[in-house]
Amino acid sequence: MRTNIAIVGSTGNAGRKTIEVLERRKFPVNILYLLASKKSVGKFVKFRNKNIEVRSLEDFDFRKADITFFCAGSKLAKTWAPKIAKDSIVIEYSSYFRSFKNIH
């Protein structure tokens, strides 16, 4: 089964490393959506010999992503991760949710 993946914070260190791991491990990606802040929108990131354009986090429909890797900071995680989780599985890297008992 191939999976639609979104990466929030795709141009930062954690986002770039996530892209690298997905490629190196040959993760079965169907569509890769790269999302970031407005300052990074329009940039291109290479994944499996294709240039993928970075899109706006604010404008993305997370129903398109089966899994979302949230590679942005705690402030954004607090606001965005719960919204995204309504439509996509969220794997969140910041420290914001670490002390929450009901987070798995």
Q: What is each of the regions a protein language model found here?
A:
Residues 1-104:
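N-terminal Rossmann-like NAD(P) cofactor-binding subdomain of oxidoreductases
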